[in-house]
A protein has these predicted regions:
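Non-catalytic cap/lid and distal C-terminal segments of serine-dependent acyl enzymes
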Residues: 1-249
Length: 249
């Protein structure tokens, strides 16, 4: 079982229709008092502010909690493993992203659409996450382009491997496997919205060569602004406080 957190605008009305933003690591979004590191995205404050300023369409935020023990296995783009030799894929991880996405699409979304007044169609449904949550957001867009109209991927963990194993040789191999997956499975260029970003401090300091190669792939496939955006935030690290600061960028 997973907790699912739902944030509604202060003026929510069942007579209106709302876009929906699905976010991973749901327990990290709203309340620093309950998170493991005493940080939060502050997504409720930021989205509320943007709504009050009429900068975004009326929306609901759905935060799907992670299970800490299986987070890496749940968020790793599972079909990218087909591009790796079996000899280097650990047999004890239990990669499970395809089941996680089925849960999101076949259980969570229908429940939200039934319980709340939502715009159900693809152009009103978005997915967002950071780090491994960035990977699973982009993977969700590739696997379910008929469900998600856009993905926001912050500080995406493009080396792919666990941070305590960040050997360059291994990261090069695993990140290439994901790019090969993207090359074959991305939606038609500019048919969906994809946002990616990174900082250059702490864990994000490892990301530039891998994000640059992914950016080059997107350009080669014809993705262009405003449907494709990749940003760098100098000095930014890999925490909820860092991501909060650029939510309204």
């Amino acid at each position: 079982p997973r907790y699912v957190f739902v944030w509604l605008p202060s003026d929510y009305s069942p007579k209106e229709k709302y876009d929906v933003l699905y976010m991973h690591d749901g327990q990290m979004l709203f309340d620093a008092n309950t998170t493991w590191n005493k940080q939060e995205w502050g997504i409720d404050e930021v989205v509320g502010k943007l709504l009050n300023e009429k900068k975004i369409k009326p929306c609901i935020v759905v935060g799907v909690a992670n299970i800490p023990e299986t987070r890496y296995a749940d968020y790793f783009p599972q079909k990218a493993l087909k591009n790796l030799p079996d000899s280097i894929v650990p047999g004890d991880v239990g990669f499970n992203a395809d089941n996680y996405l089925r849960f999101l699409v076949e259980e969570v979304k229908p429940f939200i659409d039934k319980k709340y007044s939502t715009n159900k169609s693809v152009e009103h449904t978005f997915v967002m996450g950071s780090s491994m949550g960035g990977l699973i957001s982009l993977y969700a867009l590739c696997e379910y382009p008929e469900v998600f109209g856009g993905a926001a991927c912050m500080s995406t963990h493009v080396p792919m491997i666990l941070s305590n194993e960040l050997s360059k040789e291994k990261a090069d191999q695993w990140s290439e496997a994901f790019r090969n997956y993207l090359d074959k499975n991305l939606p038609k260029a500019n048919s969906r919205m994809i946002y990616m970003d990174r900082g250059d401090a702490t864990l994000d300091a490892y990301y530039p060569p891998y994000q640059d190669k992914l950016d080059s792939l997107m350009a080669r496939k014809g993705w262009k602004t405003p449907m494709w955006i990749s940003k760098v935030f100098p000095g930014a690290g890999h925490t909820e406080e860092d991501w909060n600061k650029r939510l309204d960028n």
